Regions:
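Nucleotide-activated sugar donor-binding and catalytic core shared by glycosyltransferases
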Residues: 1-133
Length: 133
């Protein structure tokens, strides 16, 4: 384990990580899910009200552990690193199907009275070619 202070290299650390220790913020959790990382988060009376739901989501989806205090982090790390538990969390994280990038344009297209196919084309990956001339 290696503890790092503030860094702009979070993407590199997440690529090398087995799980994420952090707060129950939507950005932190979403990044961890995209990187297929289980999470170890804290939720207590001082947690922002809007972030408490994220802790419930983590528990309900079984994609990590929620601690009442980061004073319990050593125990939490030991628990999340139990092979069977880590495998279950990883399986649950991998099973998430985040389609928001497709669903939001489809909803907007419906609101605007446009065909959903238009919205789907707008988020399709672009093909880039390089000229050799």
């Amino acid at each position: 384990m290696h503890v790092v202070g503030f860094t702009k290299e979070v993407h590199k650390l997440m690529r090398a990580a087995d799980f994420l220790i952090g707060k129950p913020g939507p950005g932190s959790i979403a990044e961890a899910m995209v990187r297929r990382l289980p999470v170890l988060i804290e939720c207590n009376a001082w947690t922002l009200p809007q972030e408490r739901y994220n802790a419930e989501w983590v528990t309900e989806r079984r994609v990590g552990l929620v601690l009442k205090s980061f004073r319990e982090v050593v125990l939490g790390v030991r628990q999340i690193l139990e092979p069977a538990r880590l495998a279950e969390f990883r399986k649950n994280v991998a099973s998430l199907d985040n389609r928001a990038i497709f669903e939001i344009p489809e909803m907007l297209a419906r609101l605007l009275g446009q065909p959903a196919e238009t919205a789907q084309r707008s988020v399709a990956p672009a093909m880039h070619t390089q000229s050799t001339a």
